[in-house]
């Protein structure tokens, strides 16, 4: 909790640490699939750091292909590694902030309330107001929320 509040409240808490936030847009996820898009984002983040790390720890069972920095997968890494846990918090806080910005542009979707997660309310609002460019087509198709032929 202390780390989470610190990160939410002030970027100064992490000023002496190397980190990079990379957003991968829905069009990339739809084109490449969620796993490949995630791996590409991780590679961009690791290789885009101002400080080159000795080792990249990746939460999961695989590492990005062609990563030019030594990397090690850590299954359930967010529960066992402070570095991975901190990265997970940064990712969550960044995503939530992005949803808050989208909420200002699309208030009818109440993104500040459900943060874009597939809640009953969110699906009801999609039914009512339609699909916007920030939605992943691949996810909505799987859920039956994307018109055929689009």
Protein language model regions, located:
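Single conserved hydrophobic/aromatic residue that forms the stacking wall/gate
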Residues: 1-14
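Phosphate/pyrophosphate-binding loops at sites that engage ATP/ADP/AMP, CoA/4′-phosphopantetheine
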Residues: 16, 45-54
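Catalytic beta-strand/loop module used to bind and position nucleotide/cofactor moieties
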Residues: 33, 37-40, 55-80
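Oxyanion/phosphate-interacting regions
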Residues: 79-150
């Amino acid at each position: 909790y202390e780390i989470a509040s610190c990160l939410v409240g002030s970027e100064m808490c992490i000023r002496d640490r190397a980190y990079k936030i990379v957003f991968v847009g829905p069009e990339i996820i739809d084109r490449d699939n969620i796993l490949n898009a995630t791996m590409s984002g991780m590679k961009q983040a690791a290789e885009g750091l101002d400080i080159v790390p000795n080792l990249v720890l990746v939460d999961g069972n695989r590492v990005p292909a062609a990563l030019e920095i030594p990397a090690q997968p850590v299954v359930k890494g967010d529960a066992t590694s402070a570095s991975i846990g901190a990265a997970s918090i940064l990712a969550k806080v960044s995503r939530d902030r992005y949803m808050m910005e989208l909420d200002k542009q699309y208030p009818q979707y109440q993104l500040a309330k459900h943060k874009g997660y597939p809640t009953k309310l969110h699906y009801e609002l999609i039914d009512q107001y339609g699909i916007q460019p920030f939605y992943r087509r691949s996810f909505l198709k799987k859920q039956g929320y994307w018109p055929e032929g689009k």
